[in-house]
């Protein structure tokens, strides 16, 4: 007889945890832009969701930002021959070791390898190099050969 209240209590707790987990990160907005010009016209750069200084031909941009904090995540593609235009945005190359990235799980376009505690050896094997941004509290991971970059707020 006493197992019924315990079971109901456990169910109520599980439901509360599920609801609370589902409501976390509700202030995170995601957006997609075909070109850098489109992102600029929408105000993504002026609002700080997208870093200033991306190469002019940057395309296929995905942006996520938290309205309740300064957290942000993004990815973009650029022509590899315009990589030199990206370098002023970046500081010195740093190690992946000790870095973490924890975007909300609902940001489905964010790579699995760039979630949680980062595995430097695996990431370097994919061609990614990591940099601290030269003028913001961002981390950038760039695959120069593929012309693809990712950025996120330092945790």
Predicted regions and their residues:
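Bacterial N-terminal signal peptides that target proteins for export
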Residues: 1-11
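Processing junctions and N-termini across compartments
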Residues: 14-17, 95
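C-terminal motif of bacterial Sec signal peptides marking the signal peptidase cleavage site
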Residues: 19-22
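Bacterial signal peptide processing site
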Residues: 24-26
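N-terminal "mature-domain start" segment
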Residues: 30-60
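Mature extracytoplasmic domains of secretory-pathway proteins
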Residues: 52-121
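A short, solvent-exposed beta-edge/loop patch
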Residues: 119-155
């Amino acid at each position: 007889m006493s197992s019924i209240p315990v079971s109901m209590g456990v169910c109520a707790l599980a439901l509360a945890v599920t609801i609370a987990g589902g409501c976390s990160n509700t202030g995170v907005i995601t957006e997609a832009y075909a070109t850098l010009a489109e992102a600029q016209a929408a105000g993504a750069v002026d609002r700080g969701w997208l870093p200033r200084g991306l190469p002019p031909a940057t395309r296929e941009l995905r942006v996520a930002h938290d309205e309740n904090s300064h957290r942000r995540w993004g990815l973009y593609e650029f022509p590899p021959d315009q990589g030199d235009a990206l370098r002023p945005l970046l500081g010195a190359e740093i190690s992946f070791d000790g870095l973490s990235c924890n975007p909300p799980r609902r940001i489905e376009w964010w790579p699995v390898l760039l979630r949680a505690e980062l595995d430097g050896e695996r990431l370097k094997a994919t061609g990614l190099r990591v940099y601290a941004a030269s003028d913001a509290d961002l981390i950038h991971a760039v695959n120069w050969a593929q012309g693809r970059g990712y950025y996120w707020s330092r945790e």
